[in-house]
Amino acid sequence: MRIVTRPDFDGIVCAVLLYEALDISQPVKWVEPNAVQRGLVEIRKGDIIANLPYDDRCSFWFDHHYTNRIYRSFKGVFKIAPSAAGVIYEHYKDRFKRDYSELVTATDRIDSADLSLDEVLHPEKHGYVMLSMTVVNGGEPDEPYWEKLIGLLRQYDLQRILDDPEVKQRRRHVIEQNDKYTVYLKKNTRLDKHVSITDFRNLENIPAGNRFLVYSLFPESVVNMRIRYETKNKEMIAVSIGHSIFNRCCNVNAGLLLADFGGGGHRGAASTRFESSKADTYLPQIIDALKKNKNNEN
């Protein structure tokens, strides 16, 4: 039996809960959603997929993404919910020896972007928000740290985890990176009507930073679109869309929109990856749909 999940905070908490609820000894297999969608991941019998698209080779599946819904029978639970961790917690709640309710509630808020302006601008004052920002998704693989966090969350309370020397160092780094990221966002983001478009393709090193900062910097925008090269050889482009968490007037289901371009996700946040040769066709279409701001769920 093996856990297969994605390397974000929700995925890490999914792993914590599955390790606690089930008899699992194998290490986590960390993968990105797009790799599952493209059939690039080796999935085998006994695997438990969490927070990722369904693969019919797995034995159990837990997810909450709008565009990942399937209409055939499977073992596990699919539910539109704030987090996949919350889906797992509800399913196995009678098996836990520790009280994970606070962790799951925090994960729900973080993964669904249900955050206050103070939490976005001053994450260092909010423990779980800060801890989640030490997990950098989409950067270089960081498996030892992801595995370490799983162990810490299974054993200790939040303050003990925040005081861990490595976590402490990463917290300091997050604050430094957020300051730099603010500068990058201002330089590389433009407004097209109510759409803020952040284009990092001109940068050799993609900056890491608080994904919610852009909403505080461009309050008139209802949705942000971020563009970057996925690979160093610039053959693939990654696009992510997020509804503003402070100006909630975006009518476009982001997951459904990007499903038309090989991606998917939630109503309020989604991503896709495609060949750079398709950028001149795909990007204007995506931007046009966001500018029209029409409900695309019907």
Where are these regions (language model features)?
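Hydrophobic, aromatic-enriched interface-forming segments
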Residues: S112-V195
